Amino acid sequence: MPLWIVKMWHSQLGIDKTEKILAGFKQEKKTYVRCNTAKAPVEEIKRILSQENVSVADVEGIPYALEIKDYDYIAGLKSFRDGLYQIQDISSMTAGYMTGFKAGDTVIDVCAAPGGKSVNAAISVGTDGKVYSRDVSDYKAGLMKKIYQG
């Protein structure tokens, strides 16, 4: 961490908060991915990740979520570039899973950017359902359209 930032935090937040922030940077961050089950079953995605020498673990309670580690650069993985999964925070996946969306449902996501929850909903509702994704920012909505429509 650049010294000037540490000094700024120290002067604005005090030593205790600054130390907590710095300790947070040292903690190992977990990476969670949401499997794109429209492209492949979870077990196949796990097998492919293992072939890419990525360590994979199931996430209890969310059947399409995996924790991955032991990779250098996620965009360097063919499985990622092929769209077999998307990085998504576990809290977002939990929220999506707990809604219980099922085939044929209609979903409105009013705080949609960057789109992970909407994609999760789209996979859950399938081709018989509909997902309407909105965001307060036209810029963010445009990014989602560009990312997900090509």
Give the label of every model feature segment.
Residues 1-150:
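S-adenosylmethionine
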